[in-house]
Amino acid sequence: MGLFFFVDFPLYYLENLIKIDTGITGDYTNVGAYNFTFPKIYKQVLGVGINVYKTGTAATLENVYVTGFNNTGFSFVKDCVEAARANTVKVAYTVFYV
């Protein structure tokens, strides 16, 4: 019965189930753990993708890693090859939600 229902289920009902929002955070300079709160609360966040956003010349390699997320924000760690020369960066993020 479930297979029959799914086969006959019109595809237009499946459109727009997963939505995407993007944004850019404020500035982060120091190496460490941070939390970012989304500008709005989502019903259900499925995932978050992040990337380092740097304008100008970088003095050293920067990395950011997602450590967790929920419906109101995400947490991440900013790491740097040479912590003493850390650059000021922003984090570009993508939120996947329903």
Map each language-model feature to its residues.
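Extracellular receptor-binding modules and their adjoining Ser/Thr/Gly/Asp/Asn-rich linkers
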Residues: M1-Q44, V77-V98
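Short, exposed beta-strand/loop patches in secreted or surface proteins that constitute
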Residues: L11, E62-F69
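General "foldedness" signal
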Residues: I50-V52, E62-V64, A83, T88-K90
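A broad, low-specificity signal marking well-ordered, structured residues that form hydrophobic/aromatic
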Residues: V64, F74, Y93
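Cysteine-clustered segments with highest specificity for TGF-beta superfamily mature ligands
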Residues: F69-K78
